[in-house]
Each structure stands twice: as C-alpha cells, then as structure tokens.
C-alpha cells in the first residue's frame, strides 16, 4: 500500500456519505456474526497498535476485543512506556511504529498530534479521541439510532451541555448525514468557531435555553460537564452547567419516542438524572456496545476497502 492510497479516520468528515452507508451496513453484518458466534477472521495476523495518552475503558476494550475477533492482534502502548512520552518527535514515532504494524489507533489530547502522526504513517491511523473530535463514538451513536429508529437523515438531534469533542463531531455528522442539530451550551462555554466549518451552518442551531433545544428532538444526547484534562475547572463548571442537566422535564420537550444517549462515563445528578439515563428512553448500553461493532467495521474498511458480498 502506498502513501497515496492510505486512508485515515481522524475526523467524521474524513468519510463520505457513501462511505458511511457502507460502514454502517458492515457494522450490522459484523454485529450479527458476533451475536451468532460466527468465526470471521478477515484481518488474520494483522496487528493494531493502540497508543494511549488518555486512559480509557471503552476505547481500549472495544478496539482490543474488536481486532482479536477479526483474527488480528493488538499491542497496547502508553506514552508512559514509549519514547513518545520521553520527547521523541511524533513524526519519528509514526515512521517507526507504522513499519511494524498494520493499523494504529491513538487516543490523545491535541488533534495536531494525531494529524502529524498520520502525515508520517505508512498505515491507517484512527482517532480514538482527542480534545477536539471523537468520531468513533459519534459513529457508534449513529448506528445505535439506526438500530432503534432507522436512518437519521432528516431527523433532529439535541445536544445539551459542553461544547466539547462530541459536539464538534456531531456538527460534522449533521452536515454529512443530513440531519438537524439543535444545541445549547451555558454562557462562557459556547462553540469555538475555529473548529466549526462555515459550510455546516445550515445544519445546526444554537439555543440559550436547553429545553428549547430539545423541542421536537428525535434524539437527546449529552456528555460529562468536565472532560479529561479540564479537571481544574470542575467546580466552576458544576455551577455554570447546573441548568443543563438532562432530566425528565427536559426530555418531555422532545418527541415522545425520542432516544437518550450519553457516551459515558456518566455522573448521575450532574449532566443527567438517574431517571433519564436508567429510564425507558435511554439506549446508553447499546450505544456503548456498538463501539465494538462500528470499530470492527471501520478497521475492516480501512484495511480491506469495500468487500463484495
């Protein structure tokens, strides 16, 4: 594979609508194989390097189990244990690591790190999470919606809470997949427009009142108020976000059959009440499991392209 043919997955916008239609279809197929205990090893003897600067439960488990279920192997690499954590240039690490493995997943702080890594990699690189974007999680959310309600095109998604990596990824997804995003963030925590494409403006709307943002929504979603790396702001954020807790009253403004999602970990009583996240509209456990299935489809697609089936 030459450098020109390598595809990376660093932001949601890296794939086209047609790519997503294929990957979502493959996700459903791979999930059915998993549920039926079918052996399927298209990535036999392929190796995934997992580089973690930010710790994780769901990201590590889903990628490590996923590559194993596809017949491959995973190598866990922490910046505490590698030269990346000792000051080796990202570009040099990318050159070395990509000569020894078939695909790389990175979970780190700055998007610039993963961008530079991909620019110097001989193999596909996947964004497992950065401060700016979280494409694998939103892809899992989209598939979860599809499972429960069908295509998300033309639907309305409400985002309540912090303007974080999830929200910026939802904005990109709205533009590509053709749904409307209604969002509400507290004063002082508005969108950083440097991370938002002007072309996406028709696909999202900003509301001061989170209840207003939820009106007519088919899906209501949120995240923690304090993301990893912002712990020093925790107390200030708790005060600022107090009215942005998704509770039963707020869900009442959404459509009666609206779903609730949260990428986890959740803090009951902060960004969401127990009554909502543990209630009948919540699909958070399906959402968490689907990280496994969408990432298997993603790795298969990046390494093998479109399969004839």
Swiss-Prot record:
Assigned EC number: 2.1.3.3
Record's keyword annotation contains Ribosomal protein: no
GO biological process, one term: L-arginine biosynthetic process
One cellular component term from this protein's GO annotations in UniProt: cytoplasm
Subcellular location: Cytoplasm
Keywords: Amino-acid biosynthesis, Arginine biosynthesis, Cytoplasm, Transferase
Pfam families: OTCace, OTCace_N
Protein's pathway: Amino-acid biosynthesis; L-arginine biosynthesis; L-arginine from L-ornithine and carbamoyl phosphate: step 1/3
Reactions mediated catalytically: carbamoyl phosphate + L-ornithine = L-citrulline + phosphate + H(+)
Similarity comment text for this entry: Belongs to the aspartate/ornithine carbamoyltransferase superfamily. OTCase family.
Annotated function: Reversibly catalyzes the transfer of the carbamoyl group from carbamoyl phosphate (CP) to the N(epsilon) atom of ornithine (ORN) to produce L-citrulline.
Name of the protein this chain belongs to: Ornithine carbamoyltransferase
Gene that this sequence comes from: argF
């Amino acid at each position: 594979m030459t450098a020109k043919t390598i595809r990376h997955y660093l932001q949601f916008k890296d794939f086209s609508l047609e790519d997503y239609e294929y990957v979502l279809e493959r996700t459903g197929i791979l999930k059915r194989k998993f549920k039926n205990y079918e052996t399927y090893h298209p990535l036999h003897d392929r190796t995934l390097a997992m580089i973690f600067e930010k710790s994780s439960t769901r990201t590590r488990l889903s990628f490590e189990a996923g590559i194993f279920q596809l017949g491959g192997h995973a190598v866990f690499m922490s910046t505490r244990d590698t030269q990346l954590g000792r000051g080796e240039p990202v570009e040099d690490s990318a050159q070395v690591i990509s000569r020894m493995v078939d695909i790389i997943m990175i979970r780190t702080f700055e998007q610039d790190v993963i961008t530079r890594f991909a620019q110097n990699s001989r193999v596909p690189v996947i964004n497992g999470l950065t401060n700016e974007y979280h494409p694998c999680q939103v892809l899992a959310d989209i598939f979860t919606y599809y499972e429960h309600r069908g295509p998300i095109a033309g639907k309305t998604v409400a985002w309540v809470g912090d303007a974080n990596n999830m929200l910026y990824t939802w904005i990109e997804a709205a533009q590509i997949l053709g749904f409307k995003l209604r969002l509400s963030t507290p004063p002082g925590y508005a969108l950083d427009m440097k991370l938002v494409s002007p072309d996406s403006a028709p696909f999202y709307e900003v509301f001061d009142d989170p209840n207003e943002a939820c009106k007519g929504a088919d899906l209501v979603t949120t995240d923690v108020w304090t993301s990893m790396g912002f712990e020093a702001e925790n107390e200030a954020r708790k005060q600022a976000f107090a009215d942005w807790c998704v509770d039963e009253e707020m869900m009442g403004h959404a459509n009666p059959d609206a779903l609730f999602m949260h990428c986890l970990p959740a803090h009951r009583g902060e960004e969401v009440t127990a009554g909502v996240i543990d209630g009948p509209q919540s699909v958070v456990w399906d959402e968490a499991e689907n990280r496994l299935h969408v990432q298997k489809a993603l790795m298969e697609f990046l390494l093998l392209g479109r399969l004839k089936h």
